[in-house]
A protein has these predicted regions:
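Residue-level recognition of short, solvent-exposed, well-ordered loop/turn junctions
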Residues: 30, 37, 84-86, 192, ...
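N-terminal non-catalytic cap/leader segment that marks the start of a structured domain
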Residues: 1-57, 150-152, 158, 164, ...
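Catalytic-pocket segment enriched in acidic/His residues
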Residues: 45, 51-53, 121-234
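A structural-propensity feature for long, helix-poor, extended segments
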Residues: 70-90
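N-terminal accessory regions of nucleic-acid-interacting proteins
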Residues: 98-112
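Structural signature of FAD isoalloxazine-binding scaffolds in flavoprotein oxidoreductases
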Residues: 53-70, 85, 215-219
Length: 236
């Protein structure tokens, strides 16, 4: 067991060891500031939803209250009848970043983890902007860990619902690569340590409902698994 804030102090060992099957994994990062998503960053995904391929990164925000960890339920709000999974590679920022060039963008990255950009698809169509559709509580599962020694440029991204393969893409098919996205964002905003960037989902998104389990696997980053539950059945 380690105790620290990874952004402001070195990790300290407590000397305690716990069996993996006796602990509950939390989200590996809870952003103090923001989660930023990149929409339609795979051409095949843009086409499957009937959208044009963007000419510059299409970005949106998710609040930090949307973040949950491995094994935690995706809680379906009553306002939506069409909820979708979206498997994504997440980038965790290591230090303050402003006006970053693509050439040095990777020096601002702490590491990478898996993400599920859960979306209320019907609300997304109704609202025209995405705050409610992508910002509801539990709409951003992250985990199971942050990998700091990692090459994200040719990585397989897959998702399953109840064991059935739904998505199978690769980061080499990004429209906008990670350095381009970081440079684009920092032209107008400051990224802070612990900020998370969701880099887009490949084709194959679809509906989930209460009782399903969604598994997200990204090469080298383990499996992020979350059950899907009706919000009315969960007492907070």
């Amino acid at each position: 067991v380690l105790s620290s804030d990874p952004f402001f102090s070195p990790a300290q060992s407590t000397g305690e060891r716990l069996p993996y099957d006796e602990v509950r994994m939390l989200a590996p990062i809870l952003p103090r500031s923001k989660v930023i998503g990149v929409g339609r960053n795979f051409a095949d995904h843009a086409r499957e939803l009937g959208n044009d391929v963007p000419v510059s990164p299409l970005t949106f925000f998710k609040p930090n209250t949307s973040v949950v960890g491995p094994g935690e339920p995706i809680r379906l709000p009553a306002i939506s009848e069409e909820v979708s999974y979206e498997a994504e590679l997440a980038v965790v920022i290591s230090k303050i970043a402003k006006n970053v060039t693509p050439e040095n963008a990777y020096s601002y990255v702490l590491g990478y983890t898996a993400a599920n950009d859960v979306t209320l698809r019907d609300i997304q169509r109704i609202d025209k902007q995405w705050s409610r559709a992508k910002g509801f509580d539990s709409s951003c599962p992250l985990g199971p860990w942050i990998e700091t020694e990692y090459d994200p440029e040719n990585v397989r991204i897959r998702s399953w619902v109840d064991g059935e393969l739904k998505q199978d893409g690769n980061t080499e098919d990004f429209i906008f690569d990670i350095p381009t996205v970081i440079a684009h964002l920092t032209e107008v905003m400051t990224l802070l340590p612990g900020d998370v960037i969701l880099t887009g989902t490949p084709a194959g998104v679809g509906r989930i409902e209460a009782g399903n389990r969604v598994d997200i696997a990204i090469d080298g980053l383990g499996v992020l698994s979350n059950p899907v539950m009706d919000l009315s059945l969960i007492h907070i």
